[in-house]
Amino acid sequence: MNSRILILDCGSQFTQLIARRVREARVYSEIHPPTKSLDWIRAWKPTGIILSGGPSSVTDEGAPTIPPALLDVAPVLGVCYGMQLIAHLEGGSVVGGGRREYGRAEVTVDEASGMFAGFTAGEKTTVWMSHGDHVEQVPPGYVATAHSGNTCAGFRHKTKPIHAVQFHAEVHHSARGAEIIENFLFDICHCAPDWTPGHFIDLEVAKIREMVGDRQVICGLSGGVDSSVAAALVHKAIGDQLTCIFVDTGLLRLHEREQVERTMRAHLGIKLITVRAEDRFLNGLAGEGDPEKKRKIIGHTFIDVFEDASAEAGKNAEFLVQGTLYPDVIESVSAKGGPSATIKTHHNVGGLKPDMKFKLIEPLRELFKDEVRNVGRELGLPEEMVGRHPFPGPGLAIRVLGEVTPHALDVLRRSDAIYLEEIRAAGLYPDIWQAFAVFLPVKSVGVMGDGRTYENVVALRAVTSTDGMTADWYPFPYEVLGRISNRIINEVDGVNRVVYDISSKPPATIEWE
């Protein structure tokens, strides 16, 4: 892997999208604050540099900036604020006030080359704008490449590989944004598309083997995508030196424990210890209906159970595997170069007590979620595991509204299983970000046969999303909803009514608790 793009985050909400678009083009990228020193950047040897957008004005005191010499280290692309920063540093004119552009806009291409290779001069394209300031005059030695109304929407240096666009090419609303980014990667930076799951696995396996040697490793397995892929990757590197611990909280979905055991033991040959702690969790939750208190009870109980299990199973272990992903690692105040709240400097992981001084192995810390799924597929994990929807840490406890009881969990498990089975049968599962059933703490009157019933209500939730930050309810075909409702009412004892949640996020959250 020789090609890599350095993204300097000037504070944009879209910076992670830039990294994702670059990765989707199979080029490795990392996000760092613009306060990184010139020496550090040169030593990192970027194939290209992208300056992100941001909320500041380039003339603000303390606004993100870069040393001008950075523009000579590698080809540079400035996006939104990044474009204004280049103009400011190179002697152009950036002004605020006047016409502000937010949302979709139409840009006219002035020069059909460089960033706009594949376009035609005079062609209009839809893009996503989010700026108040704009470049009034391009710097000496630069030429405009696109405009929006009377405003410069792109420029380039006449002889150096320095390019900029005022719009957010990384956002899906920019119709040909991916093409524009790929022009920078391949035509201007001459990157090689060598960032692949297989290449990543080879590099990570070698790294893990060197780090671990012949020592023992434990992994807390949740059954979710991240911990499962992390375990499979570490197992590929060190085999039976890895022991996984899976805690059955009693709050799992139908047959979930059996599925995890089957995948890990039979399919992958991973040493797995299953801890049956259902009674411990349910006893702790008895009588508690407040969602935040339920979360805390589950969190504290899990820590106690895992510590007991790891003290026995991992008594000789020196390393702990954690499924940290790249969004967790990116420095939280990177635009100002502040310290990261998520980069770990100690061994107190996920609430575990400080005296559990394992060394961390975080094999997925360079990956986004979609890349984790692809690595899992490359490692041979079944699609039912790598393609599964997100599942909350507290499990079904936050999908039983109010007190968690064995009866409520049983009704919810069986309703949820029918729901997901029908979604898969209709071929809709991959189109949905998350789908699940909710047990409501109310009963309703119904009629079955000649008799009156007074039974439980189950709500169904399904949303589409790209990142979980915002979400829209999924528009099921009526016949699918009808089939799901009919099966739940007829096959799950104690349910006589099914409702579908058509709330978007915001204002509603995806989960009910």
From Swiss-Prot:
Pfam families found in the cross-reference section:
GATase, GMP_synt_C, NAD_synthase
Keywords, A to Z, come to: ATP-binding, Glutamine amidotransferase, GMP biosynthesis, Ligase, Nucleotide-binding, Purine biosynthesis
Q: Where is the Glutamine amidotransferase type-1 domain?
A: 4-194
InterPro entries from the xrefs?
Class_I_gatase-like, GATASE, GMP_synth_C, GMP_synth_GATase, GMP_synthase, GMPS_ATP_PPase_dom, NAD/GMP_synthase, Rossmann-like_a/b/a_fold
Q: Where is the active site?
A: 80 (nucleophile), 168, 170
EC?
6.3.5.2
Which PROSITE patterns does the record cross-reference, listed alphabetically?
GATASE_TYPE_1, GMPS_ATP_PPASE
Q: Which GO terms describe its molecular function?
A: ATP binding; GMP synthase activity
Domain (GMPS ATP-PPase) spans 195-388
Which PANTHER family does the UniProt entry name for this protein? GMP SYNTHASE [GLUTAMINE-HYDROLYZING] (PTHR11922:SF2), GMP SYNTHASE-RELATED (PTHR11922)
What is the name of the protein in this document? GMP synthase [glutamine-hydrolyzing]
